[in-house]
Each structure stands twice: as structure tokens, then as C-alpha cells.
Amino acid sequence: MVTFGYGVEATGYAGIKPASFLQLQRINNIGGITITPATIDASALEDSVTKTVAGRGETGGTWTVTVNFTSETKTEWANLISAYQTAKASGLNMWFETIVPGFEDAFFVVAQPPEAIPMPEIAQNGLLTVEFPLVIVDVKGMSAKVAFT
């Protein structure tokens, strides 16, 4: 099963992957992140056809995680938001880890959660879910996974 969680950088270790991560429960969907390079016009006046080169990569800015919204997950995400606010005040980042079975490494992303729990989508005879838009700070990619606590 795929597992997902977060960790906060330790004091004195800003920019370093946290040594511990807390697992979040009832995750329904973890959005993908595609880094799309911007194109830069590298044409000269004598060129009859535009020449482009790859520029800085663009992540799209946000990354959505959908959660089955229960009293337990509400508490988990309230604690996450509080942990982020404490970390931010100390100049530290929050990292998110996605562990996929069969891989030795996990996916890591540095991101900022919303300041409050968003209103969930409510549908007739539907599962109560909430989408958390995480602002992408840095896509770290895959590296050695850290076991969840």
C-alpha cells in the first residue's frame, strides 16, 4: 500500500531531509507533479524560424492531496498545519514523503500546507473528502525512504 506523511526540518538543519516523518491516514489521492520547462526565445535577428531553448522548470505551483475527511484526519491535518506554522516561524521547511511499495526510495517534496483546513466537497451519497492544496517549494525527487512513525 502507498503511504504518505510529513516531517519538519530539525533546528540547525534547515534544508536537510528530516530524520523522522509522521504517516497521515485515509489518503484518497496524491496528485502528480510534472516539471515543465519554460521555453526561451533564443532567436537572432537573422533567424527566419524561432529557435527556443529550455528555461527554468515550472511545477504548476500547487500539489493537491485528497483526504477522506473524518474526525481523526481533521485532527491529523490540524496538527500538521500547526507544526508547519511553528517550523515556518523558525525558518524551517515541511517535507512530504510518499512511499510506494516495491521501491527502495521514496518521493520527497518540500511544500507549504494551507493556513486552515479547506471546506470538503459534499455530495449526495458520496464520501466526505477534502482537497489540501500544498504550495510546492521544492521537488526533491526520489531518495532513501524514511520509515514513518
Segments (PLM) and residue ranges:
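Compositionally biased, intrinsically disordered low-complexity segments enriched in polar/Pro/Gly
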Residues: 1, 6, 142-149
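Solvent-exposed edge beta-strands and adjacent loop segments
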Residues: 1-69, 112-127
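Short, flexible coil/linker elements and helix-boundary hinge sites characteristic
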Residues: 5, 91, 136-138
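Short beta-strand and beta-hairpin "edge-sheet" elements
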Residues: 33, 97-143
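Acidic glycine-/aspartate-rich tracts in secreted/extracellular proteins
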Residues: 69-73, 139
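Short, acidic/charged, Gly/Pro-enriched secondary-structure junctions
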Residues: 75-111
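Short intrinsically disordered coil segments
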Residues: 79-85, 128-131, 146-149
